[in-house]
From Swiss-Prot:
GO cellular component, one term: cytoplasm
Enzyme Commission number(s) from the entry: 2.2.1.2
Protein species of origin: Desulforudis audaxviator (strain MP104C)
Enzyme class: transferase
Residue positions of the active site: K83
Catalytic activity: D-sedoheptulose 7-phosphate + D-glyceraldehyde 3-phosphate = D-erythrose 4-phosphate + beta-D-fructose 6-phosphate
Keyword Transferase among UniProt keywords: yes
InterPro entries from the UniProt entry: Aldolase_TIM, TAL/FSA, Transaldolase_3B, Transaldolase_3B/F6P_aldolase, Transaldolase_AS, TSA/FSA_arc/bac
Pfam families: TAL_FSA
Family, similarity comment: Belongs to the transaldolase family. Type 3B subfamily.
Major place of residence: cytoplasm
Pathway: Carbohydrate degradation; pentose phosphate pathway; D-glyceraldehyde 3-phosphate and beta-D-fructose 6-phosphate from D-ribose 5-phosphate and D-xylulose 5-phosphate (non-oxidative stage): step 2/3
GO molecular function per UniProt: aldehyde-lyase activity; transaldolase activity
Protein name per the record: Probable transaldolase
Length: 215
């Protein structure tokens, strides 16, 4: 399973990229608005930090307008993937973009049925929102499992991105469910890297070495 970073903060992306563990980035209008910077400039800067897919979302809700936005965004860099909301107009847009060679990531997916429709329309990626489903009393990871099973059964090329990740256990569950990718916030990536016993063990090694040096 691959890891993407779910952020529009270039400092976080730069630090995560230096670890050598992320292979892409996902953004959305809320994340970019939080940065208070020009949308196009942020996306362009991100593509210079990671050598992999960078998802940038359209704002329009009508197919033709989504396609126009997608064509403009795709000119920023070949790695830009267009995030399209899982609505009927979004499916139309995906089916129009796929023959043009513009990759899409269908977002706001909350059921395996939605994921299947997105894949049949030609989506490159689908993003089931695990955390939001859990918040609503559903089993978000079950949607990931069902989607992966369906895509595998029918050999659909669409890749599954486990999204709306809230904690490291979500990442572990996504990996066990067969998700191709989990897109994680920066703080979750940091939590994945840490463990109290690692810190205790390192301190002991260093203390033992320091005592040896004093002899």
């Amino acid at each position: 399973m691959e890891l993407f970073l779910d952020t529009a903060n270039v400092d976080e992306i730069r630090e995560a990229a230096a670890l050598g563990v992320i292979s892409g980035v996902t953004t959305n209008p809320s994340l970019i608005a939080r940065e208070g910077r020009d949308f196009t400039q942020v996306v362009r800067e991100i593509t210079g930090l990671v050598d992999g897919p960078v998802s940038a979302e359209v704002i329009s809700t009508e197919a033709e307008a989504m396609v126009a936005e997608a064509e403009e965004l795709s000119q920023i860099h070949p790695n830009v993937v267009i995030k399209i909301p899982m609505i009927l107009e979004g499916l139309k847009a995906v089916s129009m973009l796929e023959p043009r060679g513009i990759r899409t990531n269908v977002t706001l997916v909350f059921s395996a049925n939605q994921a299947l429709l997105a894949a049949l329309a030609g989506a490159s990626f689908v993003s089931p929102f695990v955390g939001r489903l859990d918040d609503a009393g559903h089993d978000g990871m079950e949607v990931v499992r069902d989607t992966v099973d369906i895509f595998d059964l029918y050999e659909l090329p669409t890749r599954v991105i486990a999204a709306s990740i809230r904690h490291p256990l979500h990442v572990l569950a996504a990996a066990k469910a067969g998700a191709h990718i989990a897109t994680v916030p920066y703080q979750v990536l940091m939590q994945m890297a840490g463990h109290p016993l690692t810190d205790v063990g390192l301190r002991k090694f260093l203390d033992d070495w320091a005592r040896l040096k004093k002899r």
